[in-house]
Structures are given as C-alpha cells and as structure tokens.
C-alpha cells in the first residue's frame, strides 16, 4: 500500500476503547486509512514520514455550539485562531449576522468560510428576530430555512431561544418553524436554550424536538435533562465544582460535550478556545480520556458528524500531537492530514480586506444624534414619577426590575439628579425610526457614557450614560464609524472599537483587534462598570429573551411575560 503520509512512533487515543495505544498511523487523501503497530504497517510506503517522537496523538477538537460574531472577527480570522488552539471543526450559528442582514448575512458568512482551513459547519438561526418585540435588519422564517437547506454546510437548526412561545403559544412562529423542521428534516438535530426549565415544561420542550441545552447548568438541572433524553453542552460559565463533580462521578460520557458559545476577541487571543475548557476540566479531576471524548467524539455524535471525532480508518485526518502528556498543550495540529499549526514555527495572520459585499460596510442608517434625543418626556410638568429601573449585577446577564421614585421638572424626567443612569436604544436599519429610553442602576458606569451597535440580538444602537453630552458624543462616534463601541468621558473618546462589517465585525487581524477590545473593557471599567464580562453584560441589556427587564426600540421589555411595559408605573405629586 502507498499512502500520502505515515505518522510513526505515536501513542494514539482510541475513542472506542478509551486507551492510548502505541501505533503508527497511515493517512491518504486526507483520511486515516490504517492504525496499528509498526510491524503491522511495515509494508506501507509513504510520500511523507512524520516522526511522532513518542508523543500522544488525539483527534482535532470539535466545538458544536458557538457564534463567530461573539469574537467580533471574520471566519478567516476565527479559523486562524482556532487552529493554534487545536480546534479543527466547528458548528457556528450566525444569528448576529442574520439579525443584521437576514439570509444574505448567513450566506455571506458561509461564503467567507469556504476558504478557511477549519471545517465550518453552520446552524440555521431559528430565532431571528429573537422575539416580535424588536426591530432587526433581517428575519429568518420557513422560506429562508428551506433555501438554506440547499447549502451543504448546514448541520442543524440553531438554538430555539424563545422557549416561552414553545410552551404557551402553539401557533407562534417558533412552533411553526419547529414543526416544519422536524417534518422536513427529521435527521438533523435541533439546538435548545432552556435556562432553569424543569419538570413538565422541560419535557414539553424535549417533546417539541429540542434535543440539547447549552445554558447555565446545575446538578439538578443536568440530571433532569439527561433523564429526559436531552444532550448537555457545557460552556465555561457552567463549569462549577458542583457541575463538574456530577459529570465526573456519574456515567455521563455520552450525554455531554464542552462548547464555548461566546468567546471575546481578547480572550480568544490570550487564553485560547475549547482547549481552555478542556484544561479546566482536567484541573477539576476529570479523566484525560473523558475530556478528550467530550471535545471530540461526543460532539461529533451529537451533530451526526460521522466522518470525524476519532482516529480510525475512514475518518477525516484531523489530529493533534501533544507537547505534554495528559495536557491540552499542542506541538502540532493537522487538518486533513496536512500540517496547519506548528508551535515551533512562526504563526502569522495575513487577513484579506473587504471580504463582504459593499453594503455590509454601510449598515448604520442613523443621522447624528442631538441632546434632545436623550430627553425623557413625562406626561406632567413637575412632580414625581415611579419608574421601572433595570438593575445590573456582576456575575449575571439577568437584570432585575425595581420601581423607584424619580423627579420631573418642566415636563422632563430629571434622571441626572437621581442615583440612576439613562439607557437608550435607537433603531438603526432605517425601517421605523423607533427609539426607547429607560433607567438603569447597579454595577454599571458611574460617569461618562458608552455606545455600541454590538447589542444582542437586534444590534440597534444602544447607549448608556451618566450625562447627556457624553451620550451624544459616544453615539455619534459609533454612527460615524458605521458601527462599533465607544467609551466617552467629559466629551473625550477614551476608547473606540470599530466594527464596520454590519456594525458587529472587524476585519483587523486578531493581534490588532484583541488589544482594542481590552482597551475598551478597561475604559468601561474605569467609568465604574463592574462585571466579569463587561461587553457581554452591556450587549445583553437589549436581549429580550434574557430575564427580567430589558430594552429594545419597542420600549422596556418584561421578559418573563413577553410584553412591552411602560417606563412610568404611576404618578405622584
């Protein structure tokens, strides 16, 4: 037998026996063709021989639940970053680009992925818009779903975010999509988003065809999901001692995998990707073989990627040579049998500019804002209003509602004389001109202002501030840049993060973007914003499926009841 490549003297992880076995590995036309002891493969001739020097060899890592746009980079940049972190296959859901450009945005992401080294499979965004209580640039319905199914890169239906409609509105758009997908594409998985659901509600979700959950987990919640036949996708925020101990102590190998979901650009550059979660699981005491399985074979099975996830005959030759035994530290990463990353060699990125259609760089259709745009008009000249207030807490993206007294003078809410800050959002697609104002408190900025078009999921212009002048300055900096994030204090832009592709992505190399993201976070933190992930906290203030009180261009949203509620609760003189 003659093959392209023969990897000699390695200890191969066998996903089926959970063992490392001293072997040689033959590869031809990008796939494994034989794995065995050197004397078993001695008749094989190869164009290239790689000396594995006794290193451990594991499959390329697979992440089946993530959003490229969370890193604010293009697929090309994302692929570059993934390879040095051992990830060779992903299933990405581009619901941010879908919210901005609809089906055109999804197709553009798929096209931008075509030349990437990493295999980028896609989930069809199922919740665009996430609710009917916001204005987005695009929408995905059954017709768009069917059109996308003609694309070979589609692997599943993306996370069903509006679980409230699934449970309580049989004729809702969400349920129509679910029923159509199950009937038309029964072999494909459906991803879920069901935080804290248990009991009958959870069983209704599973019965509707939703087969996984990637939200924050607890021991009790995991047990309930596994018993109901639901697959667990464990992201880093769920990797508590309690959760990991449950996974370690119980026979859960076939019921979970690790996923990243959202990774900020600075974290992607400095910390890594799925390998970060893998090493965290190891540190908690999970067996090395089980961690490998949770990052390779388990996700491949969940997504029915039967051609990968193991080093076995016929599988795609994606593999990693480990620099340290029993650790996710890589000396080399191979994709389709070809070297993609070598830790001993320079690894530089040369990104391509203007990878998207011209109008993707002109998506913010807002005129410059004025001070009057941030005036909150009351229905009386003077007095006191009881107002709903969004309360932000470090450690969570949930925002609690409180009701507080705020003075009114000359027909305007005097929020600047209170303990609260102003939050405002402006529809930026040129569709409705909608806008809304609210009050916000808690672990947020205490002075200055911040503005962003990176605001889940509608990506309208979101502004939070302690004074109107800085809010105007921050908003206009973002508008002028055609999208991004700006921090302003005393009329001076302290940090600017340009995101010109749809107002949510940058084409800069990761090495350039990551420090800008870090500077933005530092500037925001310097104004008093307290959160373990300030960008995620800020950007989800407009996410109307994340409890409990959020804001969109429709107004304040009571998430638990799925309805718009007024800022003013009642009046007192």
UniProtKB/Swiss-Prot annotation:
Keywords: Hydrolase, Manganese. It is an enzyme of class 3 (hydrolase). Its EC number is 3.5.4.2. It comes from the Bacteria. Gene3D superfamilies: Metal-dependent hydrolases, Urease, subunit C, domain 1. It catalyses: adenine + H2O + H(+) = hypoxanthine + NH4(+). It holds the Pfam family Adenine_deam_C. GO terms for biological process: adenine catabolic process. Its cofactor is Mn(2+). Coiled coil: none annotated. One of its GO terms (molecular function) is adenine deaminase activity. Belongs to the metallo-dependent hydrolases superfamily. Adenine deaminase family. PANTHER family: ADENINE DEAMINASE, N-ACETYLGLUCOSAMINE-6-PHOSPHATE DEACETYLASE. This is Adenine deaminase 2. The lineage of its organism: Bacteria, Bacillati, Bacillota, Bacilli, Bacillales.
């Amino acid at each position: 037998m003659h093959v392209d490549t023969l990897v000699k003297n390695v200890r191969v992880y066998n996903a089926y026996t959970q063992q490392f076995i001293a072997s040689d590995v033959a590869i031809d036309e990008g796939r494994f063709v034989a794995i065995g002891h050197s004397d078993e493969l001695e008749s094989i001739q190869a164009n290239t021989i790689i000396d594995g020097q006794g290193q451990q060899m594991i499959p390329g890592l697979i992440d089946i639940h993530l959003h490229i746009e969370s890193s604010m980079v293009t697929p090309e940049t994302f692929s570059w970053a993934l390879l040095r972190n051992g990830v060779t296959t992903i299933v990405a859901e581009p619901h941010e680009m879908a919210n901005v450009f609809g089906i055109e945005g999804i197709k553009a992401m798929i096209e931008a992925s075509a030349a990437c080294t990493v295999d980028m499979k896609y989930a069809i965004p199922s919740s665009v818009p996430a609710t009917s209580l916001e204005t987005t640039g695009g929408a995905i319905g059954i017709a768009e779903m069917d059109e996308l199914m003609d694309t070979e890169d589609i692997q599943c239906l993306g996370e069903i975010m509006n679980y409230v409609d699934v449970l309580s509105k049989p004729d809702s758009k969400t349920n129509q999509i679910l029923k159509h997908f199950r009937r038309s594409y029964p072999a494909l998985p459906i991803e879920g988003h069901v935080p804290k659901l248990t009991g009958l509600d959870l069983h209704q979700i599973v019965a509707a065809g939703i087969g996984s959950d990637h939200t924050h987990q607890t021991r009790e919640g995991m047990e309930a999901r596994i018993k109901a036949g639901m697959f667990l996708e464990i992201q880093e925020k769920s990797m508590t001692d309690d959760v990991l101990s449950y996974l370690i102590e119980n026979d859960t190998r076939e019921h979970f995998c690790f996923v990243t979901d959202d990774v900020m650009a600075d974290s992607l550059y400095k910390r890594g990707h799925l390998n970060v979660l893998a090493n965290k699981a190891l540190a908690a005491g999970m067996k090395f073989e089980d961690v490998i399985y949770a990052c390779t074979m388990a996700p491949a099975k969940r997504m029915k990627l039967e051609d990968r996830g193991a080093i076995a005959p016929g599988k795609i030759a994606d593999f990693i040579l480990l620099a340290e035994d029993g650790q996710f530290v890589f000396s080399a990463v191979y994709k389709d049998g070809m070297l993609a990353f070598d830790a001993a060699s320079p690894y530089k990125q040369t990104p391509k500019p203007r990878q998207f259609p011209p109008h993707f760089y002109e998506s913010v259709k807002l005129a410059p804002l004025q001070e009057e745009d941030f005036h909150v008009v009351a229905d009386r000249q003077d007095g006191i209003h009881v107002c709903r207030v969004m309360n932000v807490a470090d450690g969570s993206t949930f925002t609690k509602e409180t009701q507080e007294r705020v003075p009114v003078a000359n027909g305007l809410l005097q929020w600047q004389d209170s303990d609260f800050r102003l939050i405002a959002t402006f529809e930026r697609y040129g569709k409705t001109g909608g806008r809304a104002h609210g009050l916000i408190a808690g672990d947020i900025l205490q002075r200055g202002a911040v503005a962003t078009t990176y605001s889940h999921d509608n990506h309208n212009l979101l502004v939070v501030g302690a004074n109107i002048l800085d809010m105007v300055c921050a908003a206009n900096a973002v508008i002028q840049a055609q999208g991004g994030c700006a921090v302003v204090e005393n009329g001076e832009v302290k940090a600017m993060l340009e995101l010109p592709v749809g107002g949510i992505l940058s084409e800069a190399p990761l090495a350039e973007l990551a420090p800008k993201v870090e500077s933005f976070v530092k500037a925001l933190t310097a104004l008093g914003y307290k959160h373990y992930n300030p960008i995620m906290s800020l950007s989800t203030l407009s996410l109307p499926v994340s409890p409990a009180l959020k804001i969109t261009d429709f107004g304040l949203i009571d998430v638990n009841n799925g309805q718009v509620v007024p800022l003013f609760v009642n009046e007192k003189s």
